[in-house]
């Protein structure tokens, strides 16, 4: 009565309320649903499915109610089973027993694609939901599961294989994965070998690698802790293990990055190998390496798979800037490690820089102009240009600008650099210079109509766009477009807000303008928090979410389709800032993500593929061909 009374109270309080009841001891759960017509009780057994499964398995063991006998392809042993049970667990058996096939009416069926061990494993799993695996029965089980389309067993086999990969069995596991099209396992084996390749070289398993997997490994940017010479020697060892393998020599050598070896190594260790002198493809690979090394200034526009850095680590990189407290100019080159959430140092510049220009061609970083000493008027502008090679973590000097310049914009466009406007001790500049890496020289192109400094720029569709800036002490909102093919400037729709010392970048087909500053009143500077993007198709501007905090004279980079605005100066707070803000174009949202190690104004940023500093620890040295004696 007490139970019924409790139910009535619930119904009176809320006639639509559900009440859940449970009994772990009985393996039963229930809920009550009330309505105007009365109370309906729903019960669920938590043990029913396992009891039914156990019951079917007992019937199978005792040979009761079995209506078909399965015979493996490799013997005469028979396995009495229930058609309904097999069809419920396998699309293969469902089609066999219900699809009008001749086996539908047979009492004994021979399965030619399955052996005794595999068939027993599959039947045991279907009736018990349990599976025991070891390397002795794995392949038989895999073969049966693939043939009979038992997906859970295939998944268990994948887990078993992945969990047991080692140096001793990775080649065999890879073979099994390839045979049965186990994509996840195959990918895991590749990653394991890439991570442990130096250790694998010291085992007898290395020479057992199939050609396809070895070629993949040698072509991968994820292969670490090996020099190209070591990879070449490993490839030669694999080729010589069996004479028929020599037919793969040219195909395998295409994956070795000969241009990154020193000339001495090419002469002493590569050209002395017979097939490198006799095979036409291999000879051409050596010629390619020689030509590449003979033209150091041209290398950024000669990049190929064999000249690229062997690294998969692309990061946000910052360079230079002026320190907040001491007003000392930095020469630090840093990358941000997203996994470790920390900044790590790369090779510093030879000289400090701020308010400089940076651009990337072929994953080479160019640093152009700027200032080495703190001066707000640009009187200490320089004309020197340096290039950073992340493959060797080294800098080299290239041809200087025709004019010293700072507060300018630098773009990389169609394999050239364009330095636009700026200022120096002589005043504001309207001139534009173009750097040709093939000639290692700067030449003038069409200048702007008016001198500009503190402007920003970006490239899209083979054109360079320049926005805002300062002309004759007046902030601008104009947008200009430069076509390098016609050497002409054209005017586009102006921004909605005047701004200078802002930043600009391209994401997809949109040209974003962010931050900066302008006059508040007649003489006081004010942060510009508003942002907007330009559509080249519509020739119009659209506002987007405002920045969280003002930043001028910053570094800007696009990384994984997000915009990062780094450091700079806040006019509202009258100080350099260390903040890094990220804008998500898809969500139209700003977030503060992390900080610089110190507050830096006039800093610059980009994305670059590098060797993270820890990859250099304990790794073979990477000697630049340019610095080899």
UniProtKB/Swiss-Prot annotation:
MF terms (GO), sorted A to Z: cullin family protein binding
Superkingdom to which the source organism belongs = Eukaryota
Mind telling me which CDD domains this protein's record contains? BACK_KLHL9_13 (cd18449), BTB_POZ_KLHL9_13 (cd18239)
Q: Does the keyword Cytoplasm apply?
A: no
- State the Gene Ontology BP annotations: cell division; protein ubiquitination; regulation of cytokinesis
Domain BACK as annotated: residue spans: 170-271
Pfam families tied to this protein:
BACK, BTB, Kelch_1, Kelch_KLHDC2_KLHL20_DRC7
In which pathway does this enzyme or protein participate? Protein modification; protein ubiquitination
User: Cellular component per GO?
Assistant: Cul3-RING ubiquitin ligase complex
- Which InterPro entries is this protein grouped with? BACK, BTB-kelch_protein, BTB/POZ_dom, Kelch-typ_b-propeller, Kelch_1, SKP1/BTB/POZ_sf
Taking every annotated instance into account, which residue ranges of this chain make up the domain BTB?
A: 66-135
Assigned keywords, A-Z: Cell cycle, Cell division, Kelch repeat, Mitosis, Repeat, Ubl conjugation pathway
Which sections of the protein are Kelch repeats? 315-363, 364-415, 416-462, 464-509, 511-561, 562-610
Keyword Cell division tagged? yes
Primary role: Substrate-specific adapter of a BCR (BTB-CUL3-RBX1) E3 ubiquitin-protein ligase complex required for mitotic progression and cytokinesis. The BCR(KLHL9-KLHL13) E3 ubiquitin ligase complex mediates the ubiquitination of AURKB and controls the dynamic behavior of AURKB on mitotic chromosomes and thereby coordinates faithful mitotic progression and completion of cytokinesis.
Complex formation:
Component of the BCR(KLHL9-KLHL13) E3 ubiquitin ligase complex, at least composed of CUL3, KLHL9, KLHL13 and RBX1. Interacts with AURKB.
Name of the protein in question: Kelch-like protein 13
């Amino acid at each position: 009565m007490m139970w019924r009374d409790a139910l009535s109270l619930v119904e009176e309080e809320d006639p639509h309320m559900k009440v859940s009841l449970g009994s772990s001891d009985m393996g039963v759960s229930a809920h009550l649903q009330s309505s105007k017509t009365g109370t309906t009780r729903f019960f669920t057994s938590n043990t029913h499915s396992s009891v039914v499964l156990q019951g079917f398995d007992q019937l199978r063991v005792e040979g009761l109610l079995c209506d078909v006998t399965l015979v493996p392809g490799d013997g005469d042993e028979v396995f009495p089973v229930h058609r309904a049970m097999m069809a419920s667990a396998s699309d293969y058996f469902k089609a066999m027993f219900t699809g009008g096939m001749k086996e539908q009416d047979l009492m004994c069926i021979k399965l030619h694609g399955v052996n005794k061990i595999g068939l027993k494993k599959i039947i045991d799993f279907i009736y018990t939901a349990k599976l025991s695996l070891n390397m002795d029965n794995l392949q038989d089980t895999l073969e049966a599961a693939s043939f009979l389309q038992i997906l859970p067993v295939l998944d268990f086999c994948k887990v078993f294989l992945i969990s047991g990969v080692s140096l001793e069995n990775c080649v065999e596991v890879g073979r099994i994965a390839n045979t049965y099209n186990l994509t996840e396992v195959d990918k895991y084996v590749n990653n394991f070998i890439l991570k442990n390749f130096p250790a694998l070289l010291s085992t007898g398993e290395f020479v057992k690698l199939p050609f396809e997997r070895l070629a993949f490994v040698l072509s991968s940017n994820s292969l670490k802790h090996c020099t190209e010479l070591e990879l070449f020697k490993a490839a030669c060892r694999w080729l010589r293990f069996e004479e028929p393998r020599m037919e793969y020599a040219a195909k395998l050598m295409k994956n070795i990055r000969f241009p990154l070896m020193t000339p001495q190594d090419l002469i002493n260790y590569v050209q002395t190998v017979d097939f490198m002198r006799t095979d036409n493809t291999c000879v051409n690979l050596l010629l390619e390496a020689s030509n590449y090394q003979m033209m150091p200034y041209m290398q950024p526009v000669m990049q190929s798979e064999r000249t690229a850095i062997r690294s998969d680590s692309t990061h946000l990189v910052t360079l230079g800037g002026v320190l907040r407290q001491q007003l000392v100019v930095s020469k630090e080159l840093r990358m941000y490690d997203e996994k470790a959430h920390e900044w790590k140092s790369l090779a510093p510049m030879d000289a400090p820089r701020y308010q400089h220009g940076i651009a990337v061609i072929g994953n080479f970083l160019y640093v152009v102009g700027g200032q080495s000493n703190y001066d707000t008027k640009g009187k200490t502008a320089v004309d020197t240009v340096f290039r950073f090679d992340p493959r060797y973590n080294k800098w080299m000097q290239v041809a200087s600008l025709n004019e010293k310049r700072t507060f300018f914009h630098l773009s990389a466009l169609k394999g050239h650099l364009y330095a636009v406007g700026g200022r120096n001790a002589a005043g504001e500049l309207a001139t534009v210079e173009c750097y040709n890496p093939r000639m290692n020289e700067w030449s003038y192109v069409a200048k702007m109509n008016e001198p500009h400094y503190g402007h920003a720029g970006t490239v899209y569709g083979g054109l360079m766009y320049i926005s805002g800036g300062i002309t004759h002490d007046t902030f601008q909102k104009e947008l200009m477009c430069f076509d390098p093919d016609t050497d002409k400037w054209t005017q586009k729709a102006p921004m909605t807000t005047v701004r200078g010392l802002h930043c600009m970048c391209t994401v997809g087909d949109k040209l974003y303008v962010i931050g900066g500053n302008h006059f508040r009143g007649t003489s006081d500077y004010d942060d510009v928090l508003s942002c907007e993007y330009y559509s080249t198709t519509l020739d119009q501007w659209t506002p987007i979410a405002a920045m969280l905090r003002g930043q001028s004279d910053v570094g800007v980079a696009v990384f994984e389709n997000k915009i990062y605005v780094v450091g700079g100066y806040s006019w509202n707070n009258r100080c350099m800032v260390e903040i890094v803000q990220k804008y998500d174009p898809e969500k139209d949202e700003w977030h503060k993500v992390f900080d610089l190690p110190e507050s830096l104004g006039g800093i610059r940023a980009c994305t670059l593929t590098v060797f993270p500093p820890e990859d250099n620890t304990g790794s073979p040295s990477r000697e630049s061909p340019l610095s080899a004696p």
